[in-house]
């Protein structure tokens, strides 16, 4: 009895959630901290969701419980909701998550624009090069040149790589124009291909009043997609990151490496101990869905040095007092006693977890004489673009590390297992209007305009008269598991040229690829790539890109002898990949 009283006094709200006493919880929440953690690292909302107590979860969400917070194991509330298998729970949590994210986006834009206002005016180009050592992927990796103008509280960002859709890269000419003040902002998305402009004007207080929970109702197919797909959480682990100067020269004569990047001398650093950790949960899937997921696993992952650990469901510890969301019949006294060892027992549906870890090396080119400030001028813009772009979001996570001195004029970071992004800054203050050359080649340091004297022509921020304006269009883009969507798209790109039949099964929450054996896949891929060159078809859906045009022209001119030589080279690449596979298995 004393133990029960102790639990009630130390964790009164958690105990109400445990018992699903949602009516009393409603009364007690008015003066209590809804984000307090229990001894197992769960907030009230996490506890309610893990136990499947929908009524308590709704009460907590009405009281503004943080729906984005992670528990002690690094899972979000939405992850745990999907794990319950309850469509109502997923619907409720997803609706509040989207409402929260939209609110945060609206609140954050004016603050970022204020930071931009305080920074000196400038123009810069960011060249994005997506690269891969896997031949099938490297052929379809796109490039993009991002042009940025900043003048006062005005900002314009031009891009051509829009993202992923239907397993292909989407291209187009887009400009994002931001204008703002202390309490207002104007956002414009300019579609130069269709000559259409979507504008959104908002006063922060009025916009927040218009935003309602009813506007964020998820579609039923989105709930179904999550419940029939693995829960996948991909993160970049940089807690043990280390920066080391790259060496050049022969053994005994090695020196610190330096390179000239767009006219600026830069020191080259290797960034070590960067890991991509992918965690996959499948306990909410049916046996048929689990079987299909295992069969559809991408066999190319074995080539990538991925270390995988699988953790099955909890053992046969269930008792007659167990429930679906408390299968090992943990008592409140056991759960809330921080000194009590639960061993492998836990609340919630028994986890079926796979963890994949892959270490990467990133590379930095740091210049101490670069005319831009990373913190004052560049990071606020990356923060702003990260709200609508997955690769900008990954760059933001990386660029906020404690870098060596200087400006990162060139960065190479992993985006996904087989895909790297190389970002190069150049042509600083080399373009004051939108009509000038879009070349990415940087100008020498001595030719760059002084930052204090550089002025951007204000026509850059104006809309051409021939464009159609859709005023007050709602165009808030939510990043819905963007890294997982990117992961899925890249894996599908790997297999795009090797498919001989339609895909089957539902779309996944993340990186589920549809394939069979590695040998059969790679053989089909080689055959398809040869047909691609002969027939002028694009394997990765990049018919819009200039690279495809040049490759197509080259393919049309190839003779039969050159095609035979190409097939031989592909066979040699296959042998090299097989050798990498054997080495990776041996190292493990």
Swiss-Prot record:
| Ranges occupied by ANK repeats | 40-69, 73-102
- Superkingdom of this protein's organism: Eukaryota
Taxonomic lineage of the native organism:
Eukaryota, Metazoa, Chordata, Craniata, Vertebrata
Q: What's the protein name?
A: Ankyrin repeat domain-containing protein 13A
Q: Where is the UIM domain?
A: 481-500, 517-536, 547-566, 572-588
Cite the domain annotation text.
Answer: The UIM repeats 3 and 4 are required for binding to ubiquitinated EGFR and 'Lys-63'-linked ubiquitin.
Task: Please provide, alphabetically and separated by semicolons, the GO molecular function terms listed in this UniProt record.
Answer: ubiquitin-modified protein reader activity
- Compartments where found: Cell membrane; Late endosome
Q: Which GO terms describe its biological process?
A: negative regulation of protein localization to endosome; negative regulation of receptor internalization
**Pfam families for the chain:** Ank_2, ANKRD13_C
